[in-house]
Amino acid sequence: MFLTQSELGQALVKNAKVAFNEGMKMGPTGGRQIYNIKMVTDMITENDTHSYDSIARSTGEGGTYHTSVPVKGFRLIHRQGKFTDSFVTTKEMMMFDKYSVADTLKGIQGLGTSGAKRLELNLQLGIGMGAGASYQDMDGNTVSTLGADGQNAFSATKTTKAGIAYSNLQAIAFGLAGLEAHQNLFRRMVNHSGRQVKVIPTHIYHTRTPSLVNTIEEFLNSRGNVGSPNMGVNVYGYKGPRFQTIEMEYLDANPDETRDNAKANYWGLVLAKGQELQCEISQNPVVYAPLMDNETRNLNIQTDLHFSHGHRDGFNATLSNV
């Protein structure tokens, strides 16, 4: 049966947004669980860190009050990127019922998933590729993975304005020793005033490698210490899991979404939604009304989204690139 533009338009009015939003929900979510996401209206924004971490000083009777000043840290600049997708319904598909209204709505649902997948791919590659300086994305663009300090997002030599270095990178397998090593990375972090950073991680993030997933779940939900032959008390799990977990679909991915086996056991600790891993969105994925090509009579249905992301300071996350 011939599918007219009018019929397609009516179907879109009733169902397209629902299908598109359902498609967005079907996409991965690991990156959005970690990054601090906010909406913006400007193409370019600047985010500075300020460290005001003073300690009151002893002052004698009638003495001058101690004075402290904030220390300005590093600046992270966001520039909005545009990402698009579309699909075409040809006149023949409509005319010979090869592409029904339901099929068209499935395509619109796929567009919703497409935008969500690209957002997640970029966010998660920002972590999975974060031990390097940059990578080339599927469009051939060079994407920086440097933090605002000019060092790799995850590095053994992250810098501060106080001139003191700290680390948020350690290659060690998941387990009791690994958790303690990464907790110590947090304990040793310093801010731009040179004082300790008071950040407690909330989540373990990791790839979907079954052996790693199962080890983490077993470790966090066992009353006994699964790494000890004597089965001592598991301090991370006997009162209930100390950390929540986030499975990241693209943590071990290449920029073209293929699997990178060298990153199969990547994991780390993170303060989810902390201020240092940032994502700014100026336009969430949207679907536009179909456009008819006057020369071909084909219908083109399009979507786009605009966002940027980056790492300011390295205080919120660690990475084990074992």
Where are these regions (language model features)?
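Short, flexible turn/loop "capping" segments at secondary-structure junctions
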Residues: Q80-G81, Q196-K198
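Extracytoplasmic/periplasmic solute-binding protein
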Residues: G132-G147
